[in-house]
Amino acid sequence: MTSEQVDAFVQALHVAASNSTKPLVRSTLYTISATPEDAFEHSILSWKAQEYAYRQFSRDSAELPTLARGLFTEVVCENGKEHARIVARGYDKFFNMGELPWTSREAIGRYSQGPYTLSYKENGCIIFVAALSPVRLVITSKHAIGARPDAPVSHSDMGRTWLLRHLEQQNLNEVDLAAELWHRNETAVLELCDDSFEEHVLPYSAERTGLHLHGLNANTIDFKTRPMDEVNAFAEHWGFIPVRYKVFDTIEDVDAFAKKVAKTGSVDGEPVEGFVVRTTMPFTLDVEEGIVPPPYKPGQTWFYKIKFDEPYLMYRNWRELTRTMLRAKRI
């Protein structure tokens, strides 16, 4: 990936954001002040797409140039010339099995190959950690940086609080992690699970409260992420909570395991929301008429998810009903 390719990609985002009165993608500017360690002020753009837009995505789309869900860019000066840089990158938006034509069981069976890695779907909120410079990190939520006017503590601020706790436990610091992520040119993708900060449907014990590391994404235009064994090794070294996962050789093995778990909505007695399935496109892509392929290149990693209706959906429905009743009572 060249600087010119990144420039063209970010320019395509700007064009898409200004295309119509109701663009599919918008940007928000965040300014991060200079520090004694990092002498430059950073102007970071967060790119956010309309949720429905992901369903309309095609590789040649001008209205939505990427499936990335969570994307931060800035302009930097290299050798006297300004270039765009991808600061942090989330996963490509992924969908439930059967939710789109290219996540039908038939499409998955034809356009994926083993091994299939099923990571437990954690029940929190996304935090990105990336390097602003070799000595400085930026911690974001899915689309925002820093404080929020409508909340005493923002997701990104709580993410920073937990990040420093994890690093301190390992006798490491922010500069150490910044140097590593800068060298890798990667974004650490974590799940903030802290019921005292934000309660979700499934509760977390004290030992599983904090930042769960479930991805290391390359800061590239095309989606690229490290395998789970490398992600967990990184988590162990830096003090994050490793994500649980299982590996299967065939899609039939995945189907059998998912069917078994769906009967109870739990694994070893523990309720689970579902699994994120990580697979790759076949290296030789033979498109069959009537079976829509995912919008990925041969050999590229792509995700889909398996979610269970019970007990997770039941818990969520009761929660929403309770909130509705409480709001009505206040009125």
Label every PLM stretch briefly.
Residues 1-331:
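Core nucleotide-handling region used for phosphoryl-transfer chemistry
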